[in-house]
């Protein structure tokens, strides 16, 4: 969550900046996406509680059934064992036990959802009884009339119900369910409906209603009340069953999850207050009136972390935001860390449901895709909206956009979230404790996706002057980062699980084979188009879009840096060409492959080489086009990878191989998905380096030398390490007769060579 309540670095009495006033409400704040993330995390906690109850009640039975299934399997330790058949037999045998566990998990999810809904539904009545609230009667007819006028000014066709409390009440607030929302005003303000204080308070609360965030606020509070009892259930069961040794491992996870939920909920409530202040200043009240009312409120200037859990921002901070709205258009470390932490909890928890539910079916392998499809759009929308809005508003305010704190927050959040995942705790847990090295795979890929998201935000901010409305910008800010995080996290989780279950041999196969699927290829190409389109739109100067200005005159909106944009493609082509040159030199020195096993090793090594030159192009583009280069690398990375493999096709043809469209397509698409993962890992390396201010004049010979040098070094390193990167263990193959894929199964640390066996062009690799 962004930290809008942190003390200002420029003092507590900021002055309004000269120039136009940006309309920061043109783009939605990340509040809604963050709220959805909070809801999903709460439901995921319910999943865990359901599984934990199953393990405590039926854990022994589940263990006996699973052990019986395992003991009946025909394990073979010899090289070439039919692992796939063994796994399928085990899945079919344990299907009933796993389905039973899935039922418990869904029951826990239902309990979490019902508990939060009941608390939310009963909150208005309980609040009215506790605070003695009642509708304003005829004594306040003038106030009701003025309130109705302000409601129409706020765009509300049906004014909310005006409520009052006891005479001692000093605060105004809004509450209620959808369709029956109410606004509470202090009696002292109601008796003077024409005074600025009444106008400011009423306009602020009506802004909440107009923005439809009253439901979000009270639902967020209800979720907080529902999470605490849920987290107590496992601890209570452990005490009742005498499993006290489990408490130590559980308590720190529960406390950490509870703390993050509390921080996220508080951030949702704080950010909505700033949004309501800014909207109220434009519909019935004004900045001076609101500032005067806020100045009369009790203020706290905590130098500690107390402001992070406050539901309302401090008065001095609200005044500062009214004076300078651009100050809230940013994403912070805490914002990114909270979103990443909640997302890091989800994959293993989703596994606990999806794996048992699909055990015994052909769809059991989609668990990573389901997890990525759930958390990718949520994290992408949260970080994308915050960072893209910051990039956009910075064009008007002149403030710098800092990606380092956001990237650091994502790194810390994912590491803590994965390590604290409740799915790793409890008897009969599905996943073991992975090592920190394995956890870092997904975390680093998320960092790279974050840097690329900020880079895309810079590119689309350049093109904002050509967009017809704010909606065109913020919808893209939701969809494109969501796709980027979904694809990146799915790939990273696939690699992480491959390392965990089968070591580097399985991970190597995943990296070079699995990511060549059409879905990954199409996703990578769509992301490249999402980076190319704003560069094309921003090819000419324009002016500040009217929808981005609240007041003031628009300024010149500079076009994108054309030499840098051209270098994006040039860097990819040059890096790929250097990679192809390394392949040609290696083929000339090493000669033809001795057998099918060596041919397979070479082919998959070339795929790794394509990923390596994609990383080289990414680093170069980001270094010579700081900020925007991270987004533009979505173009240069696949261009570099495809160019390198196109070089392989040319070499194959020159040596006498057969050139067909099928062969060219199969070879060309092989590294595209890997290029995306290589790009994110490369960006994670440069994420925390200071960004320079290089201009187009410096993109010349130096840039060409750098990209060529990096590409040659990376490609040469892959060729040198091919025995490590692509371990091969092939059976003897009858000459002249290609063997089916399932007859060439590698050992646990080696690779399947079936796709290469009998290939017409294998002798030219």
Segments from the language model and where they lie:
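Solvent-exposed, extramembrane regions of membrane proteins
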Residues: 205-209, 311-312, 320-325, 594-600
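Active-site-proximal gating segments in proteases and membrane effectors
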Residues: 152-182, 262-271, 275, 280-339
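Hydrophobic or amphipathic, alpha-helical segments that drive membrane association/targeting
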Residues: 2-163, 226-250, 254, 258-270, ...
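Active-site recognition of the HExxH zinc-binding catalytic motif
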Residues: 185, 200-208, 212-213, 217, ...
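Post-HEXXH active-site segment of zinc metalloproteases
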Residues: 212-242, 290-294
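Extracytosolic and intramembrane catalytic regions of membrane-associated proteins
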Residues: 741, 746-751, 755-765
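Short pre-active-site segment immediately N-terminal to the catalytic Zn-binding motif
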Residues: 187-200
């Amino acid at each position: 969550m962004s930290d809008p309540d942190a003390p200002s670095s420029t003092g507590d009495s900021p002055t309004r900046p000269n120039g136009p006033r940006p309309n920061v409400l043109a783009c939605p704040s990340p509040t809604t996406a963050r709220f959805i993330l909070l809801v999903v995390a709460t439901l995921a906690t319910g999943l865990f509680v359901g599984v934990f109850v199953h393990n405590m009640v039926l854990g022994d039975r589940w263990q006996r059934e699973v052990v019986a299934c395992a003991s009946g399997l025909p394990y073979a330790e010899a090289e070439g064992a039919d692992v796939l058949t063994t796994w399928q037999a085990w899945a079919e045998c344990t299907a009933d036990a796993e389905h039973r566990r899935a039922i418990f998990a869904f029951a826990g999810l239902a309990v979490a959802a019902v508990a939060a809904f009941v608390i939310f539904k009963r909150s208005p009545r309980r609040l009215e009884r506790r605070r003695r609230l009642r509708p304003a009667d005829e004594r306040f007819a003038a106030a009701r009339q003025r309130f109705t006028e302000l409601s129409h000014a706020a765009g509300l066709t049906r004014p909310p119900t005006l409520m009052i409390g006891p005479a001692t009440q000093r605060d105004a607030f809004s509450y209620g369910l959808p369709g029956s929302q109410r606004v509470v005003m202090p009696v002292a303000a109601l008796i003077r409906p024409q005074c600025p204080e009444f106008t400011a308070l009423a306009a602020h609360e009506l802004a909440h209603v107009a923005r439809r965030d009253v439901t979000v606020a009270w639902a967020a509070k209800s979720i907080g009340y529902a999470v605490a009892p849920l987290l107590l259930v496992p601890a209570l069961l452990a005490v009742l069953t005498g499993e006290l040794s489990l408490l130590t491992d559980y308590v720190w996870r529960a406390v950490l999850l509870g703390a993050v939920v509390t921080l996220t909920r508080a951030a949702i409530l704080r950010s909505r207050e700033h949004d309501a202040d800014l909207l109220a200043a434009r519909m019935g009240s004004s900045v001076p009136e609101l500032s005067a009312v806020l100045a009369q409120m009790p203020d706290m200037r905590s130098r500690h972390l107390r402001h992070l859990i406050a539901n309302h921002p401090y008065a001095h901070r609200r005044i500062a935001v009214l004076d300078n709205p651009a100050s809230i258009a940013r994403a912070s470390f805490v914002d990114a860390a909270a979103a990443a932490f909640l997302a890091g909890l989800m994959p293993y928890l989703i596994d606990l449901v999806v794996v048992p539910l699909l055990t015994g079916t052909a769809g059991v392998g989609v668990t990573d895709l389901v997890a990525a499809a759930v958390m990718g759009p949520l994290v992408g929308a949260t970080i994308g909206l915050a960072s893209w809005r910051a990039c956009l508003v910075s064009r008007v305010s002149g403030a710098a956009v800092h990606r380092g704190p956001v990237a650091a927050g994502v790194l810390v959040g994912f590491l803590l979230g994965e390590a604290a995942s409740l799915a790793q705790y409890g008897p009969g847990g599905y996943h073991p404790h992975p090592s920190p090295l394995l956890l870092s795979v997904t975390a680093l890929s998320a960092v790279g996706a974050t840097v690329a998201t900020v880079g895309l935000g810079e590119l689309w901010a350049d093109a904002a002057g050509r967009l017809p409305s704010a909606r065109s910008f913020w919808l893209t800010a939701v969809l494109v980062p969501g796709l980027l995080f979904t694809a990146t996290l799915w790939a990273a989780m696939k690699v992480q699980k491959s390392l965990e279950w089968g070591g580097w041999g399985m991970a190597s196969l995943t990296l070079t084979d699995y990511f060549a699927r059409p879905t990954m290829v199409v996703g990578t190409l769509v992301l490249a188009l999402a980076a190319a389109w704003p560069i094309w739109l921003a090819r000419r100067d324009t002016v500040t879009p009217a929808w981005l200005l609240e007041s003031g005159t628009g300024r010149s909106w500079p076009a994108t840096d054309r030499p840098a944009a051209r270098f994006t493609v040039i860097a990819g082509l040059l890096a790929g060409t250097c990679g192809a040159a390394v392949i040609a030199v290696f083929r000339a020195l090493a000669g033809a492959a001795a057998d099918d096993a060596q041919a397979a090793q070479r082919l998959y090594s070339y795929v790794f080489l394509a990923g390596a030159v994609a990383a080289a192009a990414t680093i170069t583009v980001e270094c010579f086009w700081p900020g925007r280069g991270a987004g533009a690398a979505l173009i240069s990375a696949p261009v570099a990878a495809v160019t390198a493999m196109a070089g392989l096709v040319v070499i194959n043809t020159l040596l006498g191989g057969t050139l067909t469209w099928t062969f060219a397509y199969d070879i060309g698409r092989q590294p595209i998905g890997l290029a995306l993962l290589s790009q994110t890992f490369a960006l994670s390396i440069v994420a925390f380096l200071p960004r320079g201010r290089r201009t187009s004049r410096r993109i010349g010979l130096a840039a060409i030398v750098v990209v060529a040098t990096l590409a040659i070094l990376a490609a040469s390193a892959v060729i040198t390490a091919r025995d490590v990167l692509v371990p091969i263990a092939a059976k003897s193959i009858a000459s002249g007769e290609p063997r089916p894929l399932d007859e060439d199964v590698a050992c646990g640390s080696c690779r399947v060579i079936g796709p290469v066996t009998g290939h017409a062009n294998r002798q030219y690799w």
